[in-house]
Structures are given as C-alpha cells and as structure tokens.
C-alpha cells in the first residue's frame, strides 16, 4: 500500500511539472539576457554578472521559495487556490463594504492575470523559436511565421482537450529541467567563481552603489519569477504537497543551476550575452535544444490557457462575467474545460502582440507589470488572511509580510519604468477585463433590483393562488427565479397570457456560494410552500458547474421526484433598454446591454432540453 501511495504521489508530482512549472521553467530562455539589454545601462562585466546572478538567486529564494511555497500555499480554501479564491477567503464574514473592497482587489488580480495571459505564450514561444537565429542567422525571417504557426495550431486543438497529450507534459518538462540542470552544472564546473553570487552582498552592493541602474534593472530581474502565481492557482489540481516536492527536488535546483551556468558562461565570454541560454549548449545540441525549448514553451502556454479558462469560469459563476459556453473535455477531470470565446479572443490578442512587438526582447518590456501587480495584490490579501484566519499578531504580520510587500512594490515600481516601451499593453488588457467584469456585476444588480421592484412577494402570491386557483393542468412546471423572495416574472406572464397553472409548480433559484466545492448534502434547500408549490434553492461552489440533473437528483433524495422529459421549464427573457435613469453611465449601460444580448441562454448553460422550455419576454429600462 505504501509503495502504491508513493507511486501515486510521484505521478501527481510529475504531472505538476507539466502544468504548474511550465511558465516559470521557461524563464531561463530570456530572463538573464534581458537583464543586460542595452537600454538598461548595465554591461556584462564580472561585477555586473555577479550582481545580477545574485539578484536572481535571492529573488527566487524570497519570492518563490519563501513567499509562495512556504506561505501562500497555506492559504487554501478546501484545497483550492488562486487570487479570486484568496480574495473570497479574505473577505469571508466581513462587513459588506470591506468585502466589496477585497473582492475588487481580487478582480484587479484577475484582470492582471488576463493581461499576463496574452503576453506569456507570445514571449515564451517567440524566445524559443529565436534559437534559430543562433543556429544560423539566415533563418531569422522564419522566426515570426513559425511562432505564429505553433500558436495557431496550439489554440486550434484546444477543443480536443489535454487529457491524452497532457500525459506527455510531465515527462517532457522532466527532460527540460534535467537539460537545464546539466547545461548549467557543466558551465559552473568550467568557471566555479560564479558561485560567489550566492553571497547577497553582491546584490546589495550593486543596489547601493548604482541605485538608478539597479532600480531599472529590477524590471528585467523579475522575469526570473514570472509564472510563480501558477503554483497557487493550480493547487486545487495537484495539491500543496506535490507542488512543494516538485519545487524543492527538481525545479528550484534546475533553475538555479541554469542561471548560475549562464552567469559562468558570461564570465568566460561576455559576448555570449547575445543569447546565453542557447550558447550554453554545444553546437551539435543546438537544434535538439531548440525543439525541446519549443515543446516546453508550448506546454507553458497550455498552462496559461487552461488557467485562463479556469479563472473566467470562476468569474462567470461568481456573477462577474456573462454566461458563455463551457465544454468539458474530459469525462474524469472536472477541471479540464474549454471556453470557445475565450480561446479565440486570447489567440487574437496574442497574434496582435507578436506582430506588434516582433521579438522577445521588445516583448520583455511589456512583461512584468501585470506579474508584479498580481504578486503585490496576493501579498495584501495574504496579510488579511494571516490576521483573520491564521490569527497572526500585528507584529508577526509586520515582520513577515511587510518586507514581502516591500519587495513586490519595488519590483512593480521598477516595471512602471517600462510603461511607455510596452508595459501599457497588459495594463490595457487588464483595465478592459476589469471594466467588463464591474459593468456586468453592476448591470445584473440593477436588473435584479428592477425585477424585484416590479414583482410580487412569493408568500402572498402562493396564498392567493391557493385561495382562488386558476385552471389547473397536469404536469410539473419549473420557474427559474433570480430571487427567493419574489414571484418570477415568467410565472406572472404565464398567468396573464395563458391563465393556467400546473398541478405542481417548482420555483428554482441557483446560488453560487463563496466556497469552491459543496457536498451533495449541501446541494439544495427544499421548502414546501403549500399544496402544489415548492421552492428549491440550489447551491453550487464557485469551482463547480451548475447541473440541472444534479439538482433533480438532490430533490429526489428529499422525496420530490422530477423527470426532465416530463417537465416544462419557464424562463423570463429580459429585453433591456438603455436610458438616462440613474444607475450607470449611458455608455456602460450600452456595454451591459450588448453583453446581455450575446450571453449564453440559461437553457444552454444549464443544459435544459430546448423542447421543454417556454421563454416569456420582459421589458426593462435601465
């Protein structure tokens, strides 16, 4: 049993390599090279090389090993992670205003994540394919077409899911990290003087003696920890233990060996700054390394794509984005999903970015602001969790978290110097995402307020129907309702136009809780309102996809048996009109109306058979 358990743990750890560490693991392709980019004013002198490698070492140790692996991974919600989860965890049982503020921080984090998701696949695959220029400069014109082809194919096969090919991700990344370690270790053996960079005085002296150059250079140094957020975001899939084991036993040693190896190469040959990663390898290994690097960056891109699907689904269920099609690509893994609209929007953004920036060096300017912004928000939310849930004292939070926040904010400030050179791009994507999410949330609140204002109290309505019932027809009718307090508009319109009532009426409200998963026992609240009337409130976690079939199974456990094929579903379809009434700016109302018109119908989202649905329109002025 123990041997089998150990094998299972190792399999999960191997799988985590392919998903969690793809982005972080491909940073050696460009991070050190960009730290010596000409505009930064730092030359690859022995002192400069030791200073930068020292900064890399301590950045990885502080940000990844200490902050994320030791601290942030502790802040799980039933095993789940991610910045929205952290915001939900921090805001739980807080007053409404404080809760709204913390959830807003979570939304900003989601926006920054989406901004980062457009940059990561572009810079990763582009930096790998640029190895062609190292093999032979004549191949330079083919870099962009090959990069675009690889990414178009990757996005084009997303609807098949990653269940099959995903099994190869772990072994490929295992080989990748092994090659990173071997190349670095060999070069360190040739020039062990680079190991002096472990001494933090090299980093501190550089920052003290050349503060201006050091500050700007930090904007490139942070590239060595891009992708760290994935450790926390993917915790629900692989577990804290597997992620920590993979980091400590393989990923961290491989990354450090490779960065130190690149530094050793530069000490020996400063001209290798042209592309220190590829020049670590002997010429006969250049082409196989190019193939392996491209595979590794495709895997890193896949992790970002899957992460974006997951974050968008979470935002949809929490009511921050309109409903859209969510396809499950695996019968066994609930987390493996495909969102067609997100897929093609993401690809469109990536293609525009690649054509605009043309090279990984130009793209590096756009990379960093979103990453460091997310890191700073994570630390802020972590401080709230530490105070409220872990019961840390103020002095302990000040001792542990305040220095981490200072590091995050320093990196963020350093990256703002790249704003005009390209840093504006992920911020633009982030602002657009935040605008869409806040507009949708506010719009739905306005719609719900107006529907409740126009409707009748449920209890009084049921009493009236029992006292003076209309014509009863056989069968069961389910009325989907957004509120548990009032009568659904579909019911009022049905009585107004058809003047009939079914023998059994169920008012169904689906609510998303601020927990990731709920047990089957927590699925429904069933209330018998009177003869022939039932109210069902179905609860789902924000990581679950609401299922009508599961709701009816839970009802059957409570002796309310409902057969989908013999049930009629009544829904109200809102026709929204933008007006000058108070609520939202006119242009935001227009955006909300457009999103509402193009959102997935409730029938499709809940997979209700179309031939069992009756839709009744309601006109609402915003």
Name each model feature, range by range.
Residues 1-622:
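The structured alpha-helical core of multi-pass membrane proteins
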């Amino acid at each position: 049993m123990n041997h089998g358990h150990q094998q299972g743990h190792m399999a999960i750890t191997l799988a985590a390599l392919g998903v969690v560490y793809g982005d972080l693991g491909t940073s050696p392709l460009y991070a050190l090279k960009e730290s010596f980019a000409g505009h930064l004013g730092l030359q690859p002198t022995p002192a400069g090389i030791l200073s930068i490698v020292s900064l890399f070492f301590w950045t990885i140790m502080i940000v990844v090993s200490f902050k994320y692996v030791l601290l942030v991974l502790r802040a799980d919600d039933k095993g789940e992670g991610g910045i929205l989860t952290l915001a939900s965890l921090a805001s739980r049982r807080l007053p409404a205003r404080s809760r709204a503020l913390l959830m807003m921080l979570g939304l900003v984090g989601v926006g920054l994540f989406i901004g980062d998701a457009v940059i990561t696949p572009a810079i990763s695959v582009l930096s790998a394919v640029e190895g062609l220029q190292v093999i032979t400069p004549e191949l330079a014109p083919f870099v962009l077409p090959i990069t675009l082809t690889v990414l178009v194919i990757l996005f084009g096969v997303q609807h098949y899911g990653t269940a099959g090919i995903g099994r190869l991700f772990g072994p490929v990344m295992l080989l990748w990290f092994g090659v990173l370690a071997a190349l670095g270790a060999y070069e360190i053996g040739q020039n062990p003087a680079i190991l002096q960079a472990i001494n933090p005085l090299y980093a501190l002296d550089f920052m003290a003696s050349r503060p201006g150059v050091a500050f700007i250079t930090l904007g490139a140094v942070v590239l060595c920890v891009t992708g760290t957020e994935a450790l926390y975001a993917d915790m629900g899939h692989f577990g804290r233990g597997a992620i920590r084991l993979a980091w400590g036993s393989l990923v961290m040693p491989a990354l450090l060996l490779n960065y130190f190896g690149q530094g050793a190469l530069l000490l020996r040959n400063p001209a290798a700054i042209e592309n220190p990663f590829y020049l670590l390898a002997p010429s006969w290994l250049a082409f196989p390394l190019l193939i392996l690097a491209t595979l590794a960056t495709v895997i890193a891109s896949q992790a970002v794509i899957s992460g974006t699907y997951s974050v968008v689904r979470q935002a949809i269920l929490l009511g921050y984005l309109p409903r859209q099609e969510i396809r499950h690509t695996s019968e066994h893994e609930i987390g493996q999903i495909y969102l067609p609209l997100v897929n093609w929007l993401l690809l469109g953004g990536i293609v525009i970015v690649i054509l605009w920036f043309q090279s990984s060096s130009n793209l590096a300017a756009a990379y960093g602001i979103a990453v460091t912004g997310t890191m700073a928000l994570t630390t802020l939310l972590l401080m709230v969790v530490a105070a409220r849930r872990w019961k840390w004292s103020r002095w302990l939070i000040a001792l542990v978290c305040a220095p981490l926040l200072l590091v995050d904010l320093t990196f963020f400030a350093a990256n703002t110097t790249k704003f005009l050179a390209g840093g504006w791009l992920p911020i633009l994507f982030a602002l657009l995402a935040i605008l869409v999410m806040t507009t949708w949330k506010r719009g739905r609140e306005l719609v719900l307020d107006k529907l409740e204002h126009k409707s009748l109290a449920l209890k009084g309505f049921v009493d009236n129907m029992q006292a003076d019932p209309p014509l009863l027809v056989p069968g069961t009718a389910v009325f989907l309702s957004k509120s548990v307090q009032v009568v659904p508009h579909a019911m009022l319109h049905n009585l107004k136009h058809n003047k009939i009532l079914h023998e059994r009426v169920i008012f169904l409200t689906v609510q998303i809780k601020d927990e990731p998963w709920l047990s089957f026992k927590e699925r429904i609240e069933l209330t018998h309102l009177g003869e022939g009337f039932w109210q069902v409130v179905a609860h789902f976690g924000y990581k679950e996809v609401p299922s009508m079939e599961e709701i009816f199974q839970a009802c059957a456990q409570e002796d309310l048996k409902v057969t989908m094929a013999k049930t009629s579903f009544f829904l109200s379809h809102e026709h929204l009109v933008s007006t000058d009434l108070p609520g939202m700016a006119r242009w935001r109302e227009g955006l909300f109306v457009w999103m509402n018109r193009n959102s997935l119908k409730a029938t499709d989202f809940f997979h209700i058979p179309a031939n069992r649905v009756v839709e009744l329109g309601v006109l609402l002025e915003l």
